[in-house]
A protein has these predicted regions:
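Acidic-glycine-rich active-site phosphate/pyrophosphate-binding loop
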Residues: 17-36
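Thiamine diphosphate
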Residues: 4-5, 13, 32-176
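Charge-patterned, long linear interaction tracts outside catalytic cores
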Residues: 179-180
């Protein structure tokens, strides 16, 4: 299974949740699979989808928030695991699609192949950290706990067009959803 398949599977369990998606190919694949106003596509700022997701979860405690991240971005911003744990938003599910590669820059290896990301976040203090194949994602999202999910896939990018919405329009339509 590749990242695009993982995103399709994830989106089958998404209803009205707010989704913050990692930069590059993951954002383009999500846009191609299930574009909607509740999706915020990162166009830049590698490593910060988790931080933006945390901010949205804290600002909108009545809404469920799902972050779709990559292993490269996760490793780039490991400090976000500590901040997220300490803030402990019970409406946030942080999914890291681990392809052991920087998919958007040419599939160079990350160090994720030497690590267990679930063990890392458990070491920080996360009490609800899972491998995707061991859970029902809908149940995890519905649970009122901060959760982390690692989704292991093979490297590779699908042939998808660029996102045809400007960054300003992505922000405007997402903010409109937030302000409802």
């Amino acid at each position: 299974m590749q990242r695009r398949d993982a995103i399709k599977n994830i989106m089958k369990d998404i209803d009205d949740e707010l989704v913050i998606c990692n930069i590059g190919f993951p954002a383009k694949e999500l846009h191609d699979i299930a574009d909607r106003a509740e999706n915020f596509y990162m166009i830049g700022s590698m490593g910060l989808a988790s931080s933006i997701g945390l901010g949205v979860a804290l600002a909108k405690p009545d809404k469920k928030v799902v972050v779709i991240d990559g292993d490269g971005s996760f490793l780039m911003n490991l400090g976000a695991t500590v901040t997220t744990f300490v803030q402990n938003p019970n409406n946030l599910t942080w999914i890291v699609i681990n392809n052991e590669a920087y998919g958007s820059t040419g599939n160079q290896d990350t160090y994720a192949k030497y690590l267990d990301l679930v063990d890392i976040v458990k070491g920080v203090g996360f009490k609800h950290a899972y491998n995707y194949e061991d859970i029902d994602l809908r149940e995890v999202i519905d649970d009122d706990n901060l959760s982390f999910v690692e989704y292991n896939v093979y490297p590779g990018n699908s042939q998808v067009p660029i996102i045809d919405i400007s960054p300003i329009e992505i922000k405007k339509r997402f903010m409109k959803v937030l302000n409802k």
